[in-house]
């Protein structure tokens, strides 16, 4: 049997991608420009699955019960380095990400219409 190993062309080593909506200084899908962030960056998701409406609709009959939920969907960019993943980060930078997660949880849980 003859086997040939082929390498696929991936962007794993690309530090900056001009076409990436998450990279620093790039425009996102909604036209907002990201800042030139140097660390963990958080923003509200441009196309969130939930919105922050306070009115609630309830549907209730014998078979089905449903109600609307409000919320905020946030995006956390771990690093300005396009190729960086949590698995490749050092402990200091992983700690920064975890700290941001904690802060986001605390901030969002203070909002009256968030049920996290």
Feature locations, PLM:
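Active-site microenvironments that recognize anionic phosphate/pyrophosphate groups
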Residues: 1-116
């Amino acid at each position: 049997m003859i086997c040939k190993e082929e390498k696929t062309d991936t962007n794993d080593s690309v530090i900056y991608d001009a076409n990436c909506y998450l990279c620093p200084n790039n425009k996102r899908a909604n036209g907002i420009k990201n800042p030139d962030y140097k660390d963990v960056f958080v923003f509200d998701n441009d196309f969130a699955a939930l919105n922050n409406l306070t009115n609630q609709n309830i549907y209730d009959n014998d078979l089905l019960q449903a109600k609307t939920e409000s919320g905020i969907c946030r995006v956390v960019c771990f690093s300005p380095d396009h190729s960086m993943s949590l698995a490749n980060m050092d402990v200091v930078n992983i700690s920064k990400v975890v700290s941001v997660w904690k802060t986001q949880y605390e901030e969002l849980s203070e909002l009256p219409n968030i049920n996290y």
